[in-house]
C-alpha cells in the first residue's frame, strides 16, 4: 500500500484535540504539546495539522496563545474526511503497467487489474465514510 502513517496520526491529533478542549473549555492546543503527547515528530505534526486545516477540520490561531481547535464537532468528522485531508490526491495502489509484452490479452489483463484495484479503493472509501470519529469511542469489538 502506498499510504503513510498520516491517517492514523491525523485521527490521533483530532481525538487528542477533542479530549483536551472538552476538558479545558476550548483552549487552543499547541503543535508542540500535540507532538510531545502523541510522540509524533514536530515537522510531521506541523504537516498533518496543515492538511487538517486546509480541509477545514481544524482551525489555527497564531501567536503565544495559539494552536488548533476542531472546526466542527467530532461527531461530524468521518475517517474518510481525515483520509482525504492527509492523503490528498494519492491513489491507494501504484500500478505497474510498463511491460515489454504487448497485445490485446496483455491490455485486457492490465485493464482488469486497474478496474479491480480501483474498486477496492472505492470500497475502502465507502467503508471509511461510515465511521465517525466518535464511533471510535463506542464501537463494539467484533470477534
Language-model features, listed with the residues they occupy:
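Alpha-helical residues within the helix-turn-helix
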Residues: 36, 53-54
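Conserved segment of winged-helix/HTH DNA-binding domains
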Residues: 74-98
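A short alpha-helical element within helix-turn-helix/winged-helix DNA-binding domains
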Residues: 28-39
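Minor-groove-contacting beta-hairpin "wing" of winged helix-turn-helix DNA-binding domains
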Residues: 64-71
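C-terminal regulatory/oligomerization modules of transcriptional regulators
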Residues: 95-143
Amino acid at each position: 500500500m502506498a499510504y503513510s502513517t498520516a491517517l492514523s496520526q491525523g485521527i490521533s491529533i483530532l481525538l487528542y484535540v477533542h479530549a483536551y478542549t472538552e476538558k479545558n473549555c476550548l483552549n487552543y492546543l499547541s503543535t508542540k504539546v500535540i507532538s510531545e503527547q502523541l510522540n509524533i515528530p514536530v515537522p510531521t505534526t506541523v504537516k498533518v495539522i496543515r492538511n487538517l486545516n486546509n480541509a477545514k477540520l481544524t482551525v489555527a490561531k497564531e501567536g503565544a496563545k495559539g494552536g488548533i481547535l476542531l472546526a466542527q464537532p467530532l461527531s461530524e468528522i468521518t475517517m474518510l474526511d481525515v483520509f482525504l485531508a492527509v492523503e490528498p490526491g494519492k491513489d491507494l495502489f501504484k500500478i505497474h503497467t510498463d511491460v515489454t509484452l504487448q497485445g490485446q490479452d496483455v491490455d485486457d489483463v492490465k485493464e482488469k487489474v486497474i478496474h479491480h484495484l480501483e474498486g477496492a479503493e472505492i470500497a475502502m472509501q465507502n467503508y471509511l465514510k461510515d465511521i465517525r470519529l466518535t464511533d471510535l469511542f463506542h464501537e463494539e469489538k467484533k470477534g
